[in-house]
Amino acid sequence: MIEKLKSVEEKFENINAQLCDPDVVSDIEKYKTLMQEAKHLTPVVEKYREYKKVNADFEEAQALLDEGGLDKDFREMVQEQFEQSRDDLEKIKEELKILLLPRDP
């Protein structure tokens, strides 16, 4: 799933770059097609970027917990962040699965 999301994000970035090209802007049909595709990809890319941020938070919390040597209060705070990030990741993964489903024609 992650490879698919990386591919979608790359495609989105490519489309956005094309939309800035004066040749594309002057070709109304191509511009319209690219805008529609960008509109379709935007929710997937936004959710994927959210996933990457939450995953980084999760990994950071996990690394801190694995290090040990944390005082009790800080460890509790990191543990809460770890659990919240883990729960958020599961939710985001489910949302991404839905967003990646083929759309109806």
Regions found by a protein language model. Give the residues of each.
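Charged, heptad-repeat coiled-coil alpha-helices that serve as long linker/dimerization "arms"
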Residues: 1-105
